[in-house]
Amino acid sequence: MQIMVRDNNVDQALRALKKKLQREGVYREMKLRRHYEKPSEKRAREKAAAVRRARKMERKRMERDGIK
């Protein structure tokens, strides 16, 4: 990954770098890899996230259709 520093403005270049890293998901991956996660824990975490997403989508659909 490469960021150009223009007019010796390091602060702006750092902000651009952080934004790129955030968009690429590097921070999220670093957080996940900080400690070892057992495969069973990973499956449980991913399943819980899927359930949350499904509930959220269902709520959005119900709200959109006017059913409450």
Curated annotation (Swiss-Prot):
Where is the sequence biased in composition, kind Basic residues? Answer: 50-59
* Listed Basic and acidic residues bias regions: 37-49
Organism expressing this protein natively: Erythrobacter litoralis (strain HTCC2594)
Q: Which processes are annotated in GO (biological process)?
A: translation
> Which GO terms fall under molecular function for this chain's record?
structural constituent of ribosome
| Gene Ontology CC terms | ribonucleoprotein complex; ribosome
**Keyword entries, A-Z:** Ribonucleoprotein, Ribosomal protein
Stated family: Belongs to the bacterial ribosomal protein bS21 family.
The record's region (Disordered) falls at 37-68
Name of the protein: Small ribosomal subunit protein bS21
**What InterPro entries is this protein classified in?**
Ribosomal_bS21, Ribosomal_bS21_CS, Ribosomal_bS21_sf
